[in-house]
Amino acid sequence: MHAKLKSAFQRLRAHPLVQVLANNPGNPRTLVLIEPLWGIPYNLLAPFTTLYMYAQGITDVQIGLILSITMVVQVFFSFFGGILSDKLGRKFTTMLGDFLGWATACLVWAVSNNFWLFLLAAVLNCFEQINQTAWYCLLIEDAQPKDLVNIYTWVNIGGLVAIFFAPLSGLFVSAYSVVPVVRVLYFLFSLTMVAKTLITFKFCRETRQGQIRRAETRQASVFHMLGEYRQLIPRLLQDKAVLKAVAVSVILYIANMVSTTFFSLYVTQRLGLSENYLAFFPILNAAVMLVFMVGIQHRLHAASFRTPLWIGLALYAIAVMVLLLSPAGSLGLVLLYVFVSAMAAALVNPRKDALLQLSLNAEERARLNALIMASTIALSSPFGYLTGWLSSLDRRLPFVFNLVLFLAAMLVIGRIQEPPAEHAEA
């Protein structure tokens, strides 16, 4: 028995996902390990956020309007995210975004009961865009490029493990109804994000590139740095590899926004399933993704991006067709939709993020990420209102729209080139 345990422990230590944490101490390991402080409360809330608004009289069109308004605000914050990441450092900017964008916003969500408070909370949450750029830089800038897919896999795993807490929210909703349970969860979310901010302060350090950029921009004004985007934009538009990676990111950003916002309404209002099931769908999704990421992901050659991405997008399209063809009350087909979507996400999510980062100039990563993020949100912003309007006409239409998006992404993926071997090979 002792020999078997020792052998199992040795195999665990030799697993590529364990090795990537051992080879990348400091920021990557710290940020991966504290990600559940965001992931647990977020996934407890995720199935019920739209219903929380709907139960308090917020209409489909108002939900879509909130999405579109906040996307416009997110564009503004995204532009400044790159500048603040350079001037204040990746670490401090990450902390700033976590505190204002999550800890503060969640307190407002906890007391929201009308359109204006929900809009205020959503706008406050836009501060989170400031730290998106900084967080990605803090995570990967001191990491080895060949480890990026596995690092992003760990980020996904951190969120997936948190999903197994989701049944608790389902049980409480069944006992006490949506509104009071979600209010308490938002308050707890605020507390965990305060803790995450403090841990980041204690255990993370500024990256080497962050120190260089902070020194280079110390004397530069914010407005001067904004003006420098005029030189970055033409360079970005001339880089076909980056443009293709950005196109895929934009398409998937919109598709994720649509499915996250309207799935709960679709299965409860159109298919007639109980809202108590909403907490269990993410568990199936997480279980499938975890099995895939831990047991299969590392067996796929790290240098291969195009084929896994294309297969993942095809699976997304198949999943949407299953959902659209599901008759009322068909729990089994909804579970099949979740299962296939999870396989698709496990293939797509780590690779699309790693592909984009490997395409960027490391010296300008912060501002390029900020520019790309702002562009992604700007291009996506009209679709919040559009899909809200489509849902008000027929709750199937947002998912028909998603099907078109996945087919378009497959066309783009067919034209990308693999990243350089020295960056991707394990």
Residue map of PLM features:
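Structural signature of the two symmetry-related core transmembrane helices
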Residues: 92-107, 307-322
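Helix-to-loop junctions at the C-terminal end of transmembrane segments
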Residues: 78-89, 174, 292-305, 391
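Helix-loop junctions on the cytosolic side of multi-pass membrane transporters
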Residues: 199-216, 414-425
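Cytoplasmic helix-loop-helix junction between adjacent transmembrane helices
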Residues: 123-159
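Hydrophobic core of transmembrane alpha-helices in multi-pass small-molecule transporters
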Residues: 36, 105, 116-130, 331-347
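Helix-loop boundary and gating motifs at the non-cytosolic
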Residues: 13-73, 241-282
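Juxtamembrane intracellular "pre-TM" segments in multi-pass secondary transporters
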Residues: 2-25, 206-246
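Glycine-rich segments within core transmembrane alpha-helices of 12-TM secondary carriers
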Residues: 152-170, 373-383
